[in-house]
From Swiss-Prot:
Span of zinc fingers (C2H2-type): 291-313
Primary location class: nucleus
Identification of the protein by name: Aprataxin
Domain notes: The histidine triad, also called HIT motif, forms part of the binding loop for the alpha-phosphate of purine mononucleotide. The HIT domain is required for enzymatic activity.
Gene Ontology molecular-function annotations: DNA 5'-adenosine monophosphate hydrolase activity; DNA-3'-diphospho-5'-guanosine diphosphatase; double-stranded RNA binding; mismatched DNA binding; single-strand break-containing DNA binding; single-stranded DNA binding; zinc ion binding
Entry-linked CDD domains: aprataxin_related
Catalytic residues identified in the record: H234
UniProt-annotated stretches for the region Disordered: 104-142
Transmembrane segments: none
The gene coding this protein: APTX
EC main group: hydrolase
Domain HIT: 142-247
Reactions it catalyzes: a 5'-end adenosine-5'-diphospho-5'-2'-deoxyribonucleoside-DNA + H2O = a 5'-end 5'-phospho-2'-deoxyribonucleoside-DNA + AMP + 2 H(+); a 5'-end adenosine-5'-diphospho-5'-ribonucleoside-2'-deoxyribonucleotide-DNA + H2O = a 5'-end 5'-phospho-ribonucleoside-2'-deoxyribonucleotide-DNA + AMP + 2 H(+); a 3'-end 2'-deoxyribonucleotide-3'-diphospho-5'-guanosine-DNA + H2O = a 3'-end 2'-deoxyribonucleotide 3'-phosphate-DNA + GMP + 2 H(+)
Length: 316
């Protein structure tokens, strides 16, 4: 933003990997982040969830990080383009490292003109107060797994090697993510030296199943997505009922019910024998397969039809 004389000029620099925008006030007109003045020639870091006011608190903005990709695994286009769900599919949407064919996108959202569903921070004053929504997602989840795993509010188990969090958008009644504390971007980075860690992650996943109150009536699978849509290695522990409103697309379904979902034990054996994990280059094509029931293999035309069909298996 800049006035004719440069009085309200700001310099914004986005660091997409770290999930913040550096705000530097060049002009003299007051600029604030969460109502704290930046100061002329000073700079602060603004993260998703904070509100930037330009020129005497007249123009509030928030920042949103998303991703764009022709082959985005988990509906990245849907996340960016829809107002209602900016952070779909396990909120696997940011902090992406070394993932090919993906570009980061930073949006500065004018909270007055385009986002009537944004909730302001507690310290800000806005006519939209009381509405739910996007802003809540822009807190820690929009910054990716690396920040989420550090948040005690979402941790359900932790030890010296791993932490378990509930999937923000669970695709079944029970859906956890087991993550290592060590920074490991994906299965591509795994070597034989990580074998013990993978075995430990699997054991932690089994522990989550054992403490589940529905363990006697539900089947579970432990595994990894062939092409993860966010960085930081994570093991899915998911019940096989797939009874969840967050399961909305064919890609969601196929990512857990085709060979796109790599069984944890098979990954461990691959690392043990080959020293690395190899993934089929055409794995993304699996997401386009027709919808089939994972239990009886009946083909269904739509997600609503599939969900109705699944209910037949629950009662057996």
């Amino acid at each position: 933003h800049a006035s004719a004389r440069g009085e309200g000029f700001l310099l914004l620099k986005a660091d997409c990997n770290k999930g913040y925008v550096t705000v530097k006030q060049i002009g003299v007109n007051p600029t604030s982040v969460d109502l704290v003045d930046v100061g002329k020639d000073e700079e602060v870091k603004m993260r998703p969830g904070q509100v930037l006011h330009i020129v005497n608190k007249l123009y509030p903005f928030v920042v949103q990080f998303g991703e764009e990709s022709e082959e985005s695994v988990m509906e990245a286009e849907e996340k960016i383009q829809t107002e209602k769900r900016p952070c779909e599919d396990s909120c696997e949407n940011d902090d992406i490292e070394n993932v090919p064919k993906k570009a980061k996108k930073m949006e500065v959202v004018d909270t007055q003109s385009s986002s009537a569903d944004l909730r302001p921070s507690k310290s800000s004053v806005s006519p939209h107060e009381g509405t739910t929504s996007r802003k809540e997602h822009l807190g820690h989840w929009s910054q990716g797994l690396k920040s989420s795993m550090q948040d005690p509010k979402v941790q359900v188990y932790k030890d010296e090697k791993t932490v378990v969090i509930k999937d923000k958008y669970p695709k079944a009644r029970y859906h956890w993510l087991v993550l290592p504390w060590d920074s490991i971007s994906s299965l591509k980075s795994v070597t034989r030296e990580h074998l013990g860690l993978l075995e430990h992650m699997h054991a932690v996943g089994q522990k989550m199943i054992q403490q589940c109150p529905a363990k006697e009536s539900l089947e579970f699978r432990l595994g990894y997505h062939a092409i993860p849509s966010m960085s930081q290695l994570h093991l899915h522990v998911i019940s096989q009922d797939f009874d969840s409103p967050a399961l909305k697309t064919k890609k969601h379904w196929n990512s857990f019910t085709t060979e796109y979902f790599l069984n944890s034990e098979e990954v461990i054996e691959m690392v043990r024998s080959k020293g690395k994990v190899t993934v089929n280059d055409q794995a993304s094509e699996l997401l386009k397969l027709p919808l089939r029931c994972h239990l009886c293999k009946q083909q269904l035309s739509t997600i609503p039809q599939l969900k109705e069909h699944l209910k037949k298996h629950w009662t057996k």
